Amino acid sequence: MTIHPKAKLTFAFFVGCLLPASQSFAQEEYTEPEQAPAVTLNGSIQSDIMVAPQTDAAIGAFDDSYDNSSFLTNTFVDLQLQSKWIDAGGRFELKEWPMPGFQDKHNDFKGWGVPNLWAKFKTKVADVTLGTFYEQFGSGFILRAYEERSLGVDNSILGARVAVRPFNGAQIKAICGKQRAYWDWDTGLISGADAELSLEELITKWSESNTHLTIGGSWINKREDPDETIMADVTHKLNLPEFVNAFDARVRFQKNDFAALAEYAQKSADPNTLNNFIYSKGTAAMLSLSYSHTGLSLLAQVKRSENMGFRNKRNVPEDCSAYYINHMPAFTLDHTYTLAALYPYVTQSEGEWAYQGAIGYNFKRKTALGGRYGTKLKLNYSLVKGLENNNIDGKSGTEGLKNSFFKNGDIYYQDLNLQIDKRFTKQFEGHFMYMYQQFNKTILRGEGGNIYSNIFIGDGKWTINDRFTLRAEAQYLLTEHESGDWGCGLVELSVAPYFMFSVSDQIGRTEPKNGIYGEKAHYYNAAITFDYKAHRIMVGYGRTRAGYNCTGGVCRFVPASKGITINYNYNF
């Protein structure tokens, strides 16, 4: 196999990073010095690589829509210096030939460089950060600058951050800067402040009785050019606001086993592509209650949001994953099993009512339901509905359609799942799951109607001895809609302390063409993982089904692919 010329830069860089790290294999065990050094260096390397990706017409892998280069990679190198008074760091990123899912028609992810550089000056009562940084106010309703590499999300802020702690239990933060959007910083200027006060630090009796009460408030301001030309129709130009302000207030209470969080946010008129350039305000309200005691856990949550899509650039495509200032958390369970995650929920910025409830109980050992080793049971239910008008766009330049506060619209998503964890012997344990799901594909994907699914999952782990562990899982998704039934199986052998071998297969239909789904297809994969100290490398080969990768209500479409994949991680 001939390595593509474009791969030489990445290969040389990758090997250069590995060589210093690999020297530790031959060194003696490190002994902690009696006195820690004044300055420490730590960091990490993460490199996801696909070698010689193959065209596979049966599953639509690497057709003319995507880069079919013989070498693809997303590589990240983080370095950080730490000392008593000053910390500093940076990140190198290489996505000149990005992995599947990071190739779009605008080549937004394509490139390489050092997008993140920062220095932090710190004392006991304050710290100041200059450069790039991440931040979140409250639950993220009005500000969440964070990184999620699997989704291609990195909206770090380039500017300044100041945090002051005037006394125990109090913290005040202020920020100002521009957010990253792919490889650029051509966004509106944002500034803001956040304050939190933990009253148990001031009231001794509360602290002694395990009572905690925290109140907080936040403000964010976005500035954009008010003279930008955006037309409401062929004859009318929109009068755009120069400033958009958002506010957040929250209360968090905890007493022994009970906890509660209430939060409310509001945003001034912010016409943008997400809301079809209407001028109504945005709001979000949330209440979360939880209880945990002696094997019993309870959770109840409700959230209402309307017009809370908050971007630092108003006139970008609606499906663009960048430019977000805030993050609206999804009140749905993030599933890790393949078929349970086949139809993931995407938070709707236009508005939604979201409800979630969960109950967990541990049946004690040597009881009728607990058996010899005990049994864990968890029941979870999530329901997301639209607002009164089901997110029908209002006319540009107006205040849009009015929604009554309490009235719900159509069901967007619901998920009822029961999970059971059971140990049968000292060597064998199992995890079982049943899930009922309703997925409104018309709302969440643009077309397709409602998809109703029943999903069955069994997962067993057999600890053969101290060195060998065998795990197997079987999954089946039963539905009369969309692409029909799916099946999935996996077998995984762990050989402690270094190796893990796995083979898996998904069986289902290929992606639709001209509205018609293809024939049944096997999405097979085989992988070997090697762990040594702080190093992990995985080499695999197989097919990947086209679908959505989601975390916390944020999703990215990943096209079908086939080829050799290499994943390397090193922390030092």
Q: What is each residue range found by the language model?
A:
Residues T2-F11:
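Bacterial N-terminal signal peptides that target proteins for export
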Residues F11-A21:
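Bacterial N-terminal signal peptides
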Residues S22-A61, T204:
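Sec-dependent signal peptide cleavage junction
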Residues Q27-L41, L81-A88, F121-V125, T129, ...:
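Short loop/turn motifs that connect adjacent beta-strands in outer-membrane beta-barrel proteins
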Residues Q46, S65, L72, E208-N210, ...:
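Exposed, low-structure sequence patches enriched in small/polar residues
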Residues S69-T75, K84-A88, G169-A170, L189:
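Outer-membrane beta-barrel translocator/receptor signature
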Residues Q80-K178, K205-S207, A262, Y291-N315, ...:
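Outer membrane beta-barrel
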Residues V153-L238, E242-F247, R252:
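Hydrophobic, small-residue-rich alpha-helical packing segments that form membrane-like cores
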